[in-house]
A protein has these predicted regions:
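Membrane-interface extramembranous regions
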Residues: 2-141
């Protein structure tokens, strides 16, 4: 079996970089997602009047699950193939967030979701191809 980049000395740095980005994304999306789930509906729709509270709660669920998907599979060493899928799902969320932010606030408002989406895309590709996470048996899926 050929070694993946994550198993080489050069790949160790990539592995740690990906983990750092995964933890940061997890914290960001867990915070954003949980806030959308626990805030009262009136507060939730104050800033974003174009979306219903139910839709924003759905986005909160997606963000929370995506945040968990960034770290739990790697920490538990099970279903590690879910991490790049979670990151790819968060890229889709950030594409939508970029469009909404651009419409509401212009280019300055769209910068944060663009950068977040790029980081999530890097994690998705990195964990899919460059340095996949091994499962408990050491197998890379």
């Amino acid at each position: 079996m050929a070694a993946t980049l994550g198993e080489t000395p050069r790949g160790k740095g990539l592995h740690y970089t990906l983990w750092t980005f995964q933890v940061l994304l997890a914290l960001l999306f867990l915070f954003a997602g949980v806030m959308k789930l626990v805030l009262p509906a009136e507060k939730l729709t104050e800033q974003s009047t174009q979306f219903s509270a139910a839709f924003l709660r759905f986005i909160g669920v997606v963000e929370t699950l995506g945040g968990l998907g960034m770290v739990l599979p790697g920490m538990l060493k099970t279903k590690t193939g879910l991490t790049p899928l979670a990151a790819a799902g968060l890229v889709l969320v950030m594409i939508g967030a970029t469009m909404v932010s651009y419409q509401m606030k212009g280019m300055e408002g769209a910068a944060v979701p663009v950068v977040t989406g790029i980081v999530a895309a890097f994690v998705a590709y990195g964990r899919w191809r460059l340095a996949p996470l091994p499962d408990r048996g050491g197998r890379v899926r």
